């Protein structure tokens, strides 16, 4: 299952059914009177946050959704049936935007949450409705009202308690694979991770969801590398774990590069609680490690944790620091399911809007 976090969709609710013009015709009844029924109501377009989903890939292959039209009224005072609503199922964390991609319509945060995106048109009145003391045989009926139609954008922001950020090849995927059951692709080249990965982490008996976000490079907010499109997935995180590669040229500059991209994306993201860790400490000599630690401490204005995703050194301390910020709230079943599903997702590939 491929990962897709944005899709453009056309929706249309059902038109209302037309009212009917009919008269009662029975033997020995000369003036039967009107008995045309009303038209049925058109179906609604409903969006529902479903459990077990972690991608919008279904909307890559189908972009048009139309609800049923209401059935027309009939004679003998028979009203038309209402049109069947159509339900679009999306992952928890999905946001609905108007066609301008800026106007937020709804944000789904809980499993089972439903939102009526377009209401069906009302059915028209049959001629029986217009019978009065002065008009005993009306010969007109109302047509059904048209349904609503619009283009919308679906945008997914994965729900996680903590997010991993850093430059490409900083060891984020290795860290996630060591602390959870997630199986991200790991290799010794930049941009190995092409889509967000989720893992459920247990630290001191407390569970939380950790998201691995594809690496950022300088100029990501302008589209360089993979761009900053995946940063939306950490907007909901309560804390960020910023990993810096100890084998890089200058740990302080690496830290400032990522911080600059976070600030360029959104001030709220840059203001999140951040835990800084110097990773891959097993791959450098003690003297070089001390230099890198000092550089990072000056840049971050805090003492970084020293960890190694390969050997596990310092990893428990990092997890305890994350858990302390997140608190003791247990992870939801939805988050666990999303993490398991995300671990089996195929690599992300660019998709057309």
Curated annotation (Swiss-Prot):
<comment type="similarity">
    <text>Belongs to the TRAFAC class OBG-HflX-like GTPase superfamily. OBG GTPase family.</text>
</comment>
<dbReference type="GO" id="GO:0003924">
    <property type="term" value="F:GTPase activity"/>
</dbReference>
<dbReference type="InterPro" id="IPR006074">
    <property type="entry name" value="GTP1-OBG_CS"/>
</dbReference>
<feature type="domain" description="OBG-type G">
    <location>
        <begin position="160"/>
        <end position="327"/>
    </location>
</feature>
<keyword id="KW-0378">Hydrolase</keyword>
<feature type="binding site">
    <location>
        <begin position="308"/>
        <end position="310"/>
    </location>
    <ligand>
        <name>GTP</name>
    </ligand>
</feature>
<dbReference type="InterPro" id="IPR014100">
    <property type="entry name" value="GTP-bd_Obg/CgtA"/>
</dbReference>
<dbReference type="InterPro" id="IPR045086">
    <property type="entry name" value="OBG_GTPase"/>
</dbReference>
<keyword id="KW-0963">Cytoplasm</keyword>
<dbReference type="InterPro" id="IPR036726">
    <property type="entry name" value="GTP1_OBG_dom_sf"/>
</dbReference>
<feature type="binding site">
    <location>
        <begin position="212"/>
        <end position="215"/>
    </location>
    <ligand>
        <name>GTP</name>
    </ligand>
</feature>
<keyword id="KW-0479">Metal-binding</keyword>
<feature type="binding site">
    <location>
        <begin position="279"/>
        <end position="282"/>
    </location>
    <ligand>
        <name>GTP</name>
    </ligand>
</feature>
<dbReference type="Pfam" id="PF01926">
    <property type="entry name" value="MMR_HSR1"/>
</dbReference>
<comment type="function">
    <text>An essential GTPase which binds GTP, GDP and possibly (p)ppGpp with moderate affinity, with high nucleotide exchange rates and a fairly low GTP hydrolysis rate. Plays a role in control of the cell cycle, stress response, ribosome biogenesis and in those bacteria that undergo differentiation, in morphogenesis control.</text>
</comment>
<feature type="binding site">
    <location>
        <position position="193"/>
    </location>
    <ligand>
        <name>Mg(2+)</name>
    </ligand>
</feature>
<dbReference type="GO" id="GO:0005737">
    <property type="term" value="C:cytoplasm"/>
</dbReference>
<dbReference type="GO" id="GO:0042254">
    <property type="term" value="P:ribosome biogenesis"/>
</dbReference>
<feature type="binding site">
    <location>
        <position position="173"/>
    </location>
    <ligand>
        <name>Mg(2+)</name>
    </ligand>
</feature>
<keyword id="KW-0342">GTP-binding</keyword>
<dbReference type="GO" id="GO:0005525">
    <property type="term" value="F:GTP binding"/>
</dbReference>
<protein>
    <recommendedName>
        <fullName>GTPase Obg</fullName>
        <ecNumber>3.6.5.-</ecNumber>
    </recommendedName>
</protein>
<dbReference type="GO" id="GO:0000287">
    <property type="term" value="F:magnesium ion binding"/>
</dbReference>
<dbReference type="InterPro" id="IPR031167">
    <property type="entry name" value="G_OBG"/>
</dbReference>
<dbReference type="InterPro" id="IPR006073">
    <property type="entry name" value="GTP-bd"/>
</dbReference>
<feature type="region of interest" description="Disordered">
    <location>
        <begin position="332"/>
        <end position="353"/>
    </location>
</feature>
<comment type="subunit">
    <text>Monomer.</text>
</comment>
<dbReference type="Pfam" id="PF01018">
    <property type="entry name" value="GTP1_OBG"/>
</dbReference>
<keyword id="KW-0547">Nucleotide-binding</keyword>
<feature type="binding site">
    <location>
        <begin position="191"/>
        <end position="195"/>
    </location>
    <ligand>
        <name>GTP</name>
    </ligand>
</feature>
<dbReference type="InterPro" id="IPR006169">
    <property type="entry name" value="GTP1_OBG_dom"/>
</dbReference>
<feature type="binding site">
    <location>
        <begin position="166"/>
        <end position="173"/>
    </location>
    <ligand>
        <name>GTP</name>
    </ligand>
</feature>
<dbReference type="InterPro" id="IPR027417">
    <property type="entry name" value="P-loop_NTPase"/>
</dbReference>
<feature type="domain" description="Obg">
    <location>
        <begin position="1"/>
        <end position="159"/>
    </location>
</feature>
<keyword id="KW-0460">Magnesium</keyword>
């Amino acid at each position: 299952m491929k990962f897709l976090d944005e899709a453009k969709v056309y929706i249309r609710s059902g038109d209302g059914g037309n009212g009917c013009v009919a008269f009662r015709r029975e033997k020995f009844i000369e003036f039967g009177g009107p008995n045309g029924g009303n038209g049925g109501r058109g179906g609604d377009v409903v969006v529902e946050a479903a459990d077990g989903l972690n991608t919008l890939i279904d909307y890559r292959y189908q972009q048009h959704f139309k609800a049923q039209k209401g059935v027309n009224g009939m004679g003998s005072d028979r009203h038309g049936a209402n049109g069947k609503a159509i339900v679009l199922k999306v992952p928890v964390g999905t946001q609905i935007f108007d066609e301008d991609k800026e106007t937020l319509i709804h944000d789904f945060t809980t499993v089972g949450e439903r939102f009526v995106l377009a209401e069906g048109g009302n059915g028209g009145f049959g001629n029986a409705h217009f019978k009065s003391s002065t008009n005993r045989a009306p010969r007109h009926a109302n047509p059904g009202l048209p349904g609503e139609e619009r283009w919308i954008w679906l945008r997914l922001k994965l729900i996680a308690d903590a997010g991993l950020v850093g430059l490409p090849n900083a060891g984020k995927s290795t860290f996630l694979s060591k602390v959870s059951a997630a199986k991200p692709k790991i290799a010794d080249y930049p941009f190995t991770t092409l889509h967000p990965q989720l893992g459920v982490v247990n630290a001191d008996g407390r569970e939380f969801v950790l998201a691995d976000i594809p690496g950022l490079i300088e100029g990501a907010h302008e589209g360089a590398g993979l761009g900053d499109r995946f940063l939306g997935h950490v907007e909901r995180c309560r804390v960020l774990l910023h990993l810096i590669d100890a084998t890089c040229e200058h740990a302080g500059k690496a830290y400032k590069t990522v911080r600059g991209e976070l600030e360029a994306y959104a001030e709220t993201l840059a203001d999140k609680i951040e835990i800084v860790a110097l990773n891959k400490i097993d791959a450098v000599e003690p003297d070089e490690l001390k230099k890198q630690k000092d550089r990072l401490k000056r840049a971050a204005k805090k003492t970084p944790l020293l960890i190694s995703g390969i050997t596990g050194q310092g990893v428990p301390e990092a997890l305890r620091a994350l858990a302390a910020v997140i608190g003791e709230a247990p992870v939801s079943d939805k988050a666990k399911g999303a993490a398991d599903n995300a671990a089996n997702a195929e690599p992300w590939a660019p998709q057309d809007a």
